[in-house]
Amino acid sequence: MCEMVFRGSAQIRGRLIPSGIEQINGGMKMKEWYGWMGTILRVDLTRGKITKEPLSEELTHNFLGGRGIASKILYDETGAETDPLGPDNRLIISTGPISGTLLLGTGRFIVTAKSPMHGHLGQASGGGAFGAEVKFAGYDHIVVQGRAKKPVYLWLHDGEVEIRDAQHLWGKDTWETGKLLREELGDRYIRSLCIGPAGENLANFACPMTDEEAVPSKTGTGAVMGSKNLKAIAIRGSQSVKVADPGRYVGIVRKWWEVIPKVPFTATLKNVGTPWLIKMFNKQYNLAIRNAQEVCRPEEEVSHFYGENFVPKYRIRDFACFACRLPCQKFVRIHDGPYAGEKGRRPEYG
């Protein structure tokens, strides 16, 4: 057995365990998944019903990753008549086959729903460590339907799933909600995806937030959570993601961990973070201003937003998402003026 555990700024835990293609269980052949955990969790908030179903090989072979499988589920289970803010819409949290392993970017996840912004397929990608924790809890996809009678949150922990009262959290912003969930559940390493007042009040552009650090920011999936009276999903797991050839996989990971920081684009991203993109987008006439009514401004009007012009001055330390070699996120502190001493995360862009 080969087991490798990484711990870092995002409490990284990727475990690689070799196993056979099939295993005998009670005299019957049972599929041994690699990459996938093999389970879809379903929650019907109207009925208070929780079910688990096996992930099918047909889905994994015919549709690409978490995004593709989620698109298929939404296509099959909703239609043109489905109200994006109605109980029949689906909220789908999805991971891919390498989520929760050691390769860069494997903490990411996809949120899928029929979008309240335009009534069509809505998908948003989030970072941090939430996606990896979904896998560690034993799931590839979480499909939520229905509407709870009162605010609730889901608590997933190593095979156990609870629908808990969230009335005391309703009205709280996302940062406070995450903090209160960690205190209530007694574990500072819990990962959560939650909404704030915008999602609760069904603003069609509302987005959920995870762990005060990552935002699946497109297509209004936060409003879909609010329409279901779902304040948050809290997760803690300790399971492992299996790969077929751990030695070869670790070799690939090591190669990328060495190469990626040396690429000019990624080196700049590491040093100043996503505000670096403002300069590039402005030159490309791709900088959305005033709700995209304008796409470019004179450099003297926007240069103070360029990452290289403010991040070095205020940066305290760097931190990264799960299993990432590019700590593009920065903690900053204001040194002077009326807000001197204030600190937090620097603005993201992109």
What is the predicted function of each stretch?
Residues G8, G20, R345-R346:
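Intrinsic low-complexity/disordered segments
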